[in-house]
Amino acid sequence: DEGLVGSEMCIRDRDISDDKDLEETNLVKAKDVACYIFTSGTTGVPKAAICPNQKLMAASINIKMAGYRIDESDCMHNSLPLYHSTGLMLGLCAVVQAGASTFIKRKFSATSFWDEVQQYNTTALVYIGELCRYLANTDPTQAEQNNPLKVMVGNGLRPDVWDVFKDRFGVNRIVEIYGASEGNALFMNLLNKDKTIGMTNADVSLIEYDVADDKILKDDDGFCKQILTHDPGLLIVRIGVNAVFNGYTDAQATEKKILRDVFEEGDAWFNTGDLIKTVDVGYALGKTHYQFVDRVGDTFRWKSENVSTNEVGEILNGFSDVNMSNVY
């Protein structure tokens, strides 16, 4: 049953036909390509990242079960492009896995958002940081009071906006996600801690990176140097059987993202191109938690210290008189 008004659509019921296992389905393998997702081009021109069925399934199942924790009684608000990882994997695919309903809108509107939440009783939200910032900057409305929204999953939520969604909008569970379309690791704030991308089961490491010279630092033996403190480091993910790096359609572009002989001869790691640091979030089942710092290239040196443009921006955005800042 679909309700369609202009560019809005609410999918309420699942297909309950008897043909659940069509003859053609046995021709589709887990390793087959489900789709190509183009990267945002932060380190060059956009590239087509390969997304096989197994990655699409695994990510959406984990996000549905451990992230949203939704079921058939829930409805998700999704106004993100379905050709991007967030709108597709974190949004639509997670809904399908849960058997839940979803409200899909072609274009996000901050002024009508809470009216839509109330009208369609949306209990879950898939977000990106800018979407949340728009909502935080709106004047209080009657529709936002006693709203049914209880959980939100996405990426890029600013620390100051995080507080707004907890305190003003009353969202109990915020699951910040970190991962790349082409990457082989997923970080998730499973324990609902504040202002963190959470934890991961992947074999990851933070290595020393010289932001001034834009290069990885190595020891006398030619191997990378691990960071053992809470200082920011370049995040890398070991490539292996349980952490496959599918890469891009361009083989040369794929090879450029792989670091070899990192800690020992023959090992291979995916270079995320992001600076990450560990954070203390209190009791967390002994699991290390992380926080996004900045993209490589968006950091500068000041008085012999590495300074993240993103962190400077977060401090400026914490002032009530600042609507938005961009530091570069």
Description of each model-found segment:
Residues 97, 119-128, 136-211, 224, ...:
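Gly/Ser/Thr-rich phosphate-binding loop
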Residues 179, 239, 243-251, 255-328:
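AMP-binding/adenylate-forming catalytic core of the ANL superfamily
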Residues 18-38, 45, 69-75:
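Conserved pre-ATP/AMP-binding loop-to-beta segment of ANL
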Residues 1-11:
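Single conserved hydrophobic/aromatic residue that forms the stacking wall/gate
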Residues 33, 39-42, 76, 82, ...:
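Conserved S/T- and glycine-rich ATP-binding loop of Class I adenylate-forming
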Residues 206-236, 244-247, 280-287:
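Conserved beta-loop-beta connector loops within the AMP-binding
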Residues 13-17, 39, 56-57, 254, ...:
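Adenylate-forming
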Residues 57-75, 83-123:
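Conserved AMP-binding/adenylation subdomain of ANL enzymes
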